[in-house]
């Protein structure tokens, strides 16, 4: 740790010894000297210097590790800087040539012929993978029944043969989707690293339409770009899959394919068929072109469940193509509601007096950042939605909404949902045919039969505007944890 003490300024650093730019150091020094000279007390954390450049990969072939560092500048009385002083990323180089000595083997071999264990005896060492700590250099003495630990392995060594993790500073770390080791970053359902499932839509439907005769029936188009595809049914019928070139991938031409993994549209399709009537298709995606899902009908269709995630910009073309082809695809139904036949027009007797409802009392004022932050951070879902209509049911108001944009979700949302609000005079009152930003909670009954989205009384629901959109995006960054 090096220290620079001109005029009560302290330079704290750890690890690497690269020097930041001289001009930048001079500015930081003058700023600190001015603050100290004026008697300004230092508070809060210190300031990080910019990251230095990434080092070269620790390996010349295969996988290795690259590192970059930064330093914390702080005055007396300031807290340490928040965050890490070092970042490690995985670097992937061309595969090592056949016959190359593995990295761990090479490290053990460095101790061949050298006296160890306080004696003059020497041994030939090979890696030993049965020790508890994978990131220690545990080497077995050839021809003997013992191993010895020579400390930590070098950074970039594989934790174990075939493992995805690599050792860094004695710890086994895996790379997140951002390439940084130990970051824990994951792809969301849309394929975005660290995303919030807000750049795609979840399509989930049940296909029940089919004729009475045996043969192939169209179920759905699985469009290009679809991810996390799952299809399932329970019957003696068989799922069939056709590529964009008109050739069958699975169960075509009245021939049932064996269970297994098939290549289709740039992804692996896993086809399983139990000894019972259940049959499933699963694919991670994304698909590189359209696929046509069909069913080879042999008995009445009890229902085929299918789901996938689709980029938002592809959803409208998908709907248009399905409707243009005349395929009987049902629209997404709101959560927890079975499809109902259209209601017959209500007949109102002539001269029936209509009683005006009692006026609703004014709603409490819910403006302000604190209210927005409270409901955003404590909600299960935050989205932009258009109110299609509302209905009073028992002591609740039910809004039917169409989801436009999702800011936060803890489980998939459908294109259309029902949002419930307590009372016949909910606060806030939502007007039909308007777009709102709203924060709602998910309520599931203990037996799982009821699954509702609840807009609490005096909760967060405000007309959508560009300004409110900016405020809610800023609020998302301020939630704890």
From Swiss-Prot:
Keywords: Disulfide bond, Extracellular matrix, Glycoprotein, Heparin-binding, Secreted, Signal
One GO cellular component, as annotated: microfibril
TSP type-1 domain segment(s): 45-97
Residue ranges, annotated region (Disordered): 331-361
Top-level taxon of the source organism: Eukaryota
Pfam family, one: ADAMTS_CR_3
Comp. bias (Low complexity): 345-355
Signal sequence, renumbered to the chain: 1-42
Subunit record text: Interacts with heparin, FBN1 and FBN2.
Name of the featured protein: ADAMTS-like protein 5
Organism (species): Homo sapiens (Human)
Lineage: Eukaryota, Metazoa, Chordata, Craniata, Vertebrata
